[in-house]
């Protein structure tokens, strides 16, 4: 399988490590059982018919394996994959260049597909449905559209915010799969597998501790494992023990529920500065010094999953569970009787 990356790479060493850890085939992919079982059927049927796989939309919080699965789909189809992202496709001409370069059965992977400009998105419609695109020749009064046929291909789109996709685009995906957070047991297995690939031993208790604080997210579990490996190597330890894992998590300020410094800052701000809410996400972003998109795509999904935050039409609201944990007692007069005169939840 040929892979061509069109996105700007992160640190080269980190990219190489990610590629080492990333499963290459469907049988190596952990979790999302119903999703992968269905994909196996769809891929097998497409190969039997010698057709391109139908277009696939992968949605869900970041770090759950959408990019990995896109590469696996290409591998299972025996196809090449070209990868880019929505923000990079700022002009229809950029997309046209990609589409005309595809061979029969190739996979085009667009990460953050919800961030494509509307004009570029509309350009995809005929490509997805009829495998053709219209190219404008010349300009002004002599401008004319020329129709070009392109090879049948599979578009795999990944999004953390499927609600931002337009209905016409969403309707053109024949396969729509949503990722769920992973259980601690599955994450423990992922950590154990990754430690073997990274050539570092790890105790099961240490793997369990890392898995339990990984927010249900394999990417975070693998990142925490790499940082624990750093601590182990500095201590000249051949195995990551539970003590080393705990030291790593403490130094990174990650608590028992996987909340980090920014999670706590967000909740502390909502509970104590905005009296439990509601507060608009724009105001919240300014208050904590973080980008609005980052709050919505990275932090909020897990805080909602963990039961600390609710989204309402009026803004973000802290739950009773959040008030119990994060209140400093200063919001008693603002929270509708949830607190007594001593600042305790009534």
Swiss-Prot record:
Which of this chain's residues are annotated to bind DNA?
Answer: 311, 316
Select a single GO molecular function from the record's annotations and give it: four-way junction DNA binding
The record's CDD domains line, in alphabetical order, gives:
AAA
Ranges where the record places region Head domain (RuvB-H): 256-346
Annotated Mg(2+) binding sites: 67
Quote the cellular component terms of the Gene Ontology held in the record: cytoplasm; Holliday junction resolvase complex
Output the Gene3D superfamilies linked to this UniProt entry. Answer: 1.10.8.60, P-loop containing nucleotide triphosphate hydrolases, Winged helix-like DNA-binding domain superfamily/Winged helix DNA-binding domain
Q: What keywords appear on the UniProt entry?
A: ATP-binding, Cytoplasm, DNA damage, DNA recombination, DNA repair, DNA-binding, Hydrolase, Nucleotide-binding
Q: What class of enzyme is it?
A: hydrolase
Q: What is its EC number?
A: 3.6.4.-
Swiss-Prot/TrEMBL catalytic activity: ATP + H2O = ADP + phosphate + H(+)
Q: Does the keyword Acyltransferase apply?
A: no
Give me the ranges of the annotated region Large ATPase domain (RuvB-L): 1-182
Q: Name one Pfam family in it.
A: RuvB_C
Task: Give its localization.
Answer: Cytoplasm
Q: What does this protein do?
A: The RuvA-RuvB-RuvC complex processes Holliday junction (HJ) DNA during genetic recombination and DNA repair, while the RuvA-RuvB complex plays an important role in the rescue of blocked DNA replication forks via replication fork reversal (RFR). RuvA specifically binds to HJ cruciform DNA, conferring on it an open structure. The RuvB hexamer acts as an ATP-dependent pump, pulling dsDNA into and through the RuvAB complex. RuvB forms 2 homohexamers on either side of HJ DNA bound by 1 or 2 RuvA tetramers; 4 subunits per hexamer contact DNA at a time.
Q: Which NCBIfam families match?
A: PRK00080.1 (NF000868), ruvB (TIGR00635)
Please quote what the entry notes about the protein's domains: Has 3 domains, the large (RuvB-L) and small ATPase (RuvB-S) domains and the C-terminal head (RuvB-H) domain. The head domain binds DNA, while the ATPase domains jointly bind ATP, ADP or are empty depending on the state of the subunit in the translocation cycle. During a single DNA translocation step the structure of each domain remains the same, but their relative positions change.
Record note on quaternary structure: Homohexamer. Forms an RuvA(8)-RuvB(12)-Holliday junction (HJ) complex. HJ DNA is sandwiched between 2 RuvA tetramers; dsDNA enters through RuvA and exits via RuvB. An RuvB hexamer assembles on each DNA strand where it exits the tetramer. Each RuvB hexamer is contacted by two RuvA subunits (via domain III) on 2 adjacent RuvB subunits; this complex drives branch migration. In the full resolvosome a probable DNA-RuvA(4)-RuvB(12)-RuvC(2) complex forms which resolves the HJ.
Q: Which family does it belong to?
A: Belongs to the RuvB family.
Name this protein carries in UniProt: Holliday junction branch migration complex subunit RuvB
